[in-house]
Regions:
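Active-site neighborhoods and metal-handling regions in enzymes and metal-associated proteins
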Residues: 1-488
């Protein structure tokens, strides 16, 4: 990587050279002649006639709903800032979900402000870093300047794309400090903005805003459903990519699987929606195995839990448990088929008017039946479920909301989510599993080290549900046929 030397570089780190007095207002290492050269000779690259982003009409409707919920109050929703990885390198930026949901914008330092226009109604303004002109040197001297990290949109361009008036964010903190009237802000994304609002907000009022924005995302609009399907379709292709290279993964490690899927995510989307779980052999018994540094062995199972995130930040979340050599052993098939039967029961319970917990209860009932049938638990099944004894091997809940966050709507109230009722437009995962740890002495030896999870992304429809990830086979026999075809 190139190493920038900016005006902010501490004096002791500046080159030990003698420079004549400069008039250009930059730092001593820049001659007046160079400064003048860098100010001129540039074409006008302002973009005109830009089409609004695809979700612009939807983000407007979301802001209108937000305005109705908090009349007469100033609302501040930051995108967030770059986070340091180490020294002078940063993590890839990902805008806060709340900000992206309401604007469609994904640039760092952005802030959406809804200013009340009276007892009801708001005007929305998005505050952004404008393009730097060619006068102050920022565009070529700063490590975040245009010649270092790329062109950012001008404020006029941003207005065309987002359909929201845009202003310079560098003036916002001072304006917020001086502003009067009730204010709410989404916390945790921008310390500068939070500092400006310290004496104007309370945690309780801000939490109400965060909760509202979480619950507002529960029912997806048409744009969101399309993006989720796009994410799932790319994920299906990513799983196919993995099957085709399992022989190479056997020669290396789980990292080969992770890298293969990541390639698909970056080619077709923005990124992976979460850390890919590429768990081979006994690692499949670790629910969130993201180290992905283990061996991949023929005869073992591979639990692959991964999802592509689209450019608009909607993610898939799909899991398949695959026989690495293409064929399940008898005990692997027995456990897999039990999980498949459990998932079938869970998916059937997803429908409008059902309780969110219904699909979890349906799935768990099947797994409890299997564990009693296999002699691993003493019945009756209802006693097992009442005491939660099956959870030694099922461990986790059977699903969660899905959207811009892999675990979407996480701040929603209990009564609106886990104790709530399903509605058309909600999207959730159904993902039962059985996990027999390698050191579990309460099960026969042949069970030990086998972990199975099957996960699909299910959209609640007016008359039932639709499996967005139906393009990936689930039944054990269908999985084997699919793998054989892909391996050639």
């Amino acid at each position: 990587m190139a190493d920038e030397l900016t005006p902010e570089t501490p004096e002791e780190e500046q080159p030990k050279k003698t420079h004549k007095q400069r008039k250009n207002g930059l730092y001593p290492g820049v001659s007046d002649e160079l400064a003048e050269s860098m100010r001129s000779g540039w074409a006008d690259t302002e973009l005109h006639g830009l089409e609004p982003i695809a979700q612009a009409a939807h983000t407007l409707a979301r802001r209108d709903a937000l305005s109705r919920r908090f009349p007469g109050e100033r609302l501040v929703i930051p995108a967030g800032r770059l986070k340091t990885r180490s020294n002078d390198t940063e993590y890839p930026f990902r805008a806060s979900t709340e900000y992206a949901y309401l604007t469609g914008d994904q640039t760092e330092n952005g802030v959406l402000v809804l200013e009340p226009t009276g007892p009801t109604g708001h005007t929305a303004t998005v505050y952004l870093l404008p393009r730097s002109d060619r006068e102050n040197g920022e565009f070529w001297l700063s490590g975040q300047g245009e010649l270092w990290v790329g062109r950012r949109h001008s404020l006029a361009e941003a207005e065309q794309l987002l359909g929201i008036p845009a202003k310079d964010v560098r003036k916002l903190a001072e304006a917020l400090t001086e502003a009067e009237g009730p204010v709410r802000a989404v916390r945790g994304h921008d310390a500068v903005i939070e500092s400006a609002l310290t004496d104007k907000v309370t945690k309780e009022r801000d939490e109400e805003l965060r909760v509202y924005l979480s619950e507002a995302r529960a029912v997806k609009d048409a744009f969101e459903i399309g993006e989720l399907q796009k994410a799932v379709d790319s994920t299906v292709r990513g799983f196919e990519d993995v099957v085709k290279v399992l022989d190479k993964a056997e020669a290396t490690s789980e990292r080969y699987i992770e890298g293969t899927f990541f390639l698909r995510a970056r080619v077709e989307g923005n990124d992976v929606g979460y850390g890919s779980i590429c768990a081979a052999g006994p690692h499949a018994c670790t629910l969130h195995w993201v180290r992905n540094d283990g061996d991949v062995r023929s005869g073992d199972l591979l639990l692959l839990d991964a999802g592509v995130e689209t450019h608009s930040l909607y993610t898939a979340d799909v899991t398949r448990t695959l026989p690495i050599n293409g064929t399940y052993t008898d005990i692997q098939r027995k456990i897999y088929d039990a999980v498949y039967e459990s998932q079938e029961a869970g998916i059937a319970a997803v429908k409008p008017g059902a309780k969110f917990r219904d699909f979890h209860d349906a799935s768990q009932h099947v797994l409890a039946e299997k564990l009693v049938e296999w002699g691993l638990l003493d019945g009756p099944v209802e006693r097992v479920l009442e005491l939660g004894l099956q959870r030694r091997w099922t461990l986790h809940g059977t699903g969660h909301m899905l959207g811009m966050d892999v675990h979407d709507c996480a701040a929603a109230r209990t009564e609106a989510y886990v104790e709530g009722t399903l509605e058309p437009g909600m999207c959730l995962t159904v993902e039962p599993g059985l996990y027999f740890q390698a050191d579990d002495l309460t099960v026969p030896e042949e069970y030990r080290g086998i972990g199975v999870r099957i996960e699909d992304d299910i959209l609640v429809t007016e008359d039932g549900n639709r499996n967005l990830s139906a393009g990936l086979p689930r039944a054990s026999s269908e999985v084997e046929v699919w793998m054989a075809r892909l391996k050639g």
